[in-house]
Amino acid sequence: MTVGDKEELSDDIVETYSVSGASHVLALSGLHIGFLYALLLFVLRPLWRRWRRLKPLLLLLLVLFLVSFAFFTGLSSSVVRSVIMFSLLAFAGLQPEKPLTLNTLAATAFLMLLCKPVWLFDVGFQLSFSAVAAIVLVQPKLYAFWKVDNRFLRYLWGLMTVSMAAQLGTAPLVIFYFSRFSTHFLLTNLWVIPMVSLVLYSAVFLLMLTPLPFVQHLFARVVEALVHVQNEVLRWIERLPGAAVDDIWLDIWGVLLVYLFLGMAYYGFLRLTVRRVCFALLALLAVVSWHSLSIMSNASRQGIAFYSVRGCPVVHCMADNRHSWLACADSLPDMPCLCRALSPHWNRLRLETPRLVAGDYTTSGLSMRNQIVSYAGKRICLLSDNRWRNKSSSHPLSVDYLYVSKGYQGGIEELTSLFSMGMVVLDASLSDYYQNKIANDCVRLGIPYLLLSQKGSYRILL
């Protein structure tokens, strides 16, 4: 959690944080950089109060430390955004009368995209900037609703308004990418943000105890207990009724229309007039109309699909009654990875959870034998090993699609005596060299081919 390393997190823990709405604390973001910035500020502020001329130098030292931390943690987009924002905040301390606004956020985005334009399509980049923009715009308005004199209640109200604003800004993107909305996010953030601050500061103190191994070992038990308590409460929130709404979806145009509605609603909220309310209602009508149209156009239809999910070569055979089958080229497919990647797509098509087919199988309308799938009059050969190499036939078998994935080590020409191929589909698990080699063979033999690594997915309606 301190450095954003999620390699050793179990699937149960990741799911608990996802359902409860606390996933943002697992990934390094503005929350973590903010804690680090506050700690450094606490250490350095007494020095520049005593020697004012050192303030610019100490602020520069603070910024260099933040930049070093960003390099240490891998320069993820959310960390880079946070480091730039807090660096600007630090230098703004030299002129306190100039607050940070949306202009600062826009300047940060411009600098990041200038260095790496592809960040625009990064999920972390989009979520990070949408959350901060919503906090800057919406949180002060929400906070002004209730004037609280009690210091503790004022802190809780501030925490709640920040959570509501961030959730408002990121909800459309979260639904688009993850098909999930956590309903208990307020309760989660009221618990997890104070606990994360305790855990992070305790972890920093634990590192400082390195010269004292015995004391460090004892204090490690304290940190472990804090993490355990944090996780147990999140598990309790996960088990609450209606903790998350799953299987919901938006397409890209739906996301843009929802943001248009939120923008119009905010515009009307600033000054309530009939005209502004009408604009917001029209935007809401556009959202509902588009989503209804999408549901009708994405109704379950019979077809075959190939997906670009590295390490999971499958053929998805879909019926028009919401049932479907995943014919796997690998005997041990990574189903959790496949489901995480494709659940939003399946939800949008309103499909039930597909049935896994990993060996010889026969049912009404579909059969699979020797890695050859027959479905709805189409025949697909899954080529993931060398079983068909160095073999020939006087009567080549007609296959509509030859699906080549990692494991096959031969060429295409040697298979022409076995199969009459309509199209060759190259899985993303193949190396770039091998994809180019087979693609060149297909061009030479006049066989159409498809690169899933470039296409992303390929769906055939039957």
Model-flagged regions — what are they?
Residues L153, P241-Q302:
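Glycine- and aromatic-enriched alpha-helical transmembrane segments of multi-pass membrane proteins
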Residues I295-V314, V424:
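Alpha-helical transmembrane signal-anchor/signal-peptide segments
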Residues M1-M85, F91, L168:
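Aromatic-rich juxtamembrane segments at the membrane interface
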Residues A38-P46, L207, L260-G268:
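Hydrophobic, aromatic-rich transmembrane alpha-helices
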Residues C312-L462:
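Extracytosolic and intramembrane catalytic regions of membrane-associated proteins
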Residues L75-Y259:
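Internal transmembrane alpha-helical bundles of multi-pass membrane proteins
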Residues L61-L64, L105-A109, V277-A286:
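Central hydrophobic cores of alpha-helical transmembrane segments
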Residues W48-R53, A92-T104, S202, G268-R276:
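Membrane-helix interface "capping/anchor" motifs
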